[in-house]
C-alpha cells in the first residue's frame, strides 16, 4: 500500500475549490485522507465549520469506498456524523477510514477525523455501488 499521499481533488469542483484532499491506501480495507484548515473553512466562533467537516468526510470516505468497490462509482446513501471536538486555522486534519463490509450493491464504512491535538468527529456511512467506472 502507499506511504505517500496523493491529491484526489485535481478536477475543478467543490473539493478542489475548498482546498482539496490528499489520500492514501493503507491496507485493502483501511485508508487515510488529510487536509489543512484554512481561513475560509472557519465559522463565526473561530472553529472549523461543521458543513466543511461533513464534506471532507464524505469526499475522503467516498474515495475509500470507491477504491474498495473495485473503482466503481458509488453514491452516498447515509452518512451519520458525531461532532466531538473542534479544529482551527492551520490544523492538519486526518481521516482514518475502515471499510466494514462490501456487498454486491453496498459498501459500509466507519471514519474517525482527528487533528494532532484531538478527535474531531466520528462517522459511519453506507454507499450504493453503481454499474459505472470513471
Language model: regions and residue ranges:
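Terminal targeting signals and extreme-terminal segments of soluble enzymes
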Residues: 1-134
Amino acid at each position: 500500500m502507499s506511504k505517500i499521499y496523493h491529491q484526489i481533488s485535481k478536477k475543478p469542483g467543490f473539493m478542489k475549490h475548498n482546498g482539496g484532499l490528499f489520500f492514501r491506501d493503507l491496507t485493502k480495507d483501511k485508508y487515510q485522507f488529510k487536509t489543512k484548515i484554512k481561513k475560509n473553512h472557519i465559522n463565526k466562533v473561530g472553529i472549523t465549520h461543521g458543513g466543511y467537516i461533513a464534506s471532507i468526510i464524505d469526499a475522503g470516505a467516498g474515495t475509500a469506498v470507491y477504491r474498495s468497490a473495485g473503482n466503481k462509482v458509488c453514491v452516498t446513501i447515509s452518512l451519520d456524523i458525531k461532532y466531538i471536538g473542534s479544529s482551527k486555522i492551520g490544523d492538519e486534519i486526518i481521516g482514518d477510514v475502515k471499510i466494514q463490509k462490501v456487498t454486491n450493491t453496498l459498501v459500509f464504512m466507519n471514519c474517525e477525523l482527528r487533528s494532532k491535538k484531538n478527535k474531531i468527529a466520528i462517522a459511519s456511512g453506507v454507499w450504493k455501488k453503481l454499474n459505472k467506472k470513471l
